[in-house]
Each structure stands twice: as C-alpha cells, then as structure tokens.
Amino acid sequence: MSITKDQILEAFAAMSVMEVVELIEAMEEKFGVSAAAAVVSGGAEAAVVEEQTEFNVVLTAHGDNKVAVIKAIRGATGLGLKEAKAMSEAAPVAVKEGVSKEEAEALKKELTEAGASVEIK
C-alpha cells in the first residue's frame, strides 16, 4: 500500500517546525540536494541603464524657411553666415554636440519654429 500526496501533506501539517527542519535536512542528505533558494542572475538585461546626460542636436532638413533656420543656427553656434548656410545645406548634420537635455530641447524648439526638421540623439 502506497502513501498518497494528501497523507504526506497531513503528516507535514501535524509536525512541529523543528521536525520539518530535521526532515528537510534528512532529505538533503539522502538525495544530495540543497533546499536553498536558487539565485537567478539577470545578466545583461537586468543591468542598470545609465541615463544619457549629453545629447546631440541634429538638423535633418532646413525646410522652406532657409533664412530663419540659418539665423537660428548662427545664434546657437556663433558661426558666421557662410558657415551657418553651409551647415544648413549639409543636412543631416549635428548643429551642437554634447549639450544638456534642456539646452538640446531649447535648440530643437528654436530650429523647429524656424521651419527646420530636427532630431535629438
């Protein structure tokens, strides 16, 4: 006659905590296993993602109002008229690199209002 799972559970329920601990230790010895919880490592997926602190403002197209875009580029970079015009015509091009998020957002807004297409990377 074999013992059912329900009978085993009833036997566990009737045991004291010390008796359960002794039973677990005996099972570990008999079967050569450990009852310790397995530690799962997250690997690369669980690595802390570092928040980006420096951004590049990239002009992707100067749009229809090229003059306003050139003025915005000059104001933001301090370039001369010729250099700012060349930059606007060389799109896609980084207008400013390594700037803070706030500065990048402000420059994007300024260039977008002038009619340019801008990305922050």
Curated annotation (Swiss-Prot):
Designated name of the protein: Large ribosomal subunit protein bL12
One of the protein's GO biological processes: translation
Keyword entries, A-Z: Ribonucleoprotein, Ribosomal protein
GO molecular function: mRNA binding; structural constituent of ribosome
InterPro entries: Ribosomal_bL12, Ribosomal_bL12_C, Ribosomal_bL12_C/ClpS-like, Ribosomal_bL12_oligo, Ribosomal_bL12_oligo_N_sf
Role played: Forms part of the ribosomal stalk which helps the ribosome interact with GTP-bound translation factors. Is thus essential for accurate translation.
Gene Ontology CC: cytosolic large ribosomal subunit
Similarity section: Belongs to the bacterial ribosomal protein bL12 family.
Pfam families noted in UniProt: Ribosomal_L12, Ribosomal_L12_N
Organism whose genome encodes this protein: Shewanella baltica (strain OS185)
SUPFAM superfamilies per UniProt: ClpS-like, Ribosomal protein L7/12, oligomerisation (N-terminal) domain
HAMAP family assigned to the protein according to its UniProt record, in alphabetical order: Ribosomal_bL12 (MF_00368)
Subunit structure: Homodimer. Part of the ribosomal stalk of the 50S ribosomal subunit. Forms a multimeric L10(L12)X complex, where L10 forms an elongated spine to which 2 to 4 L12 dimers bind in a sequential fashion. Binds GTP-bound translation factors.
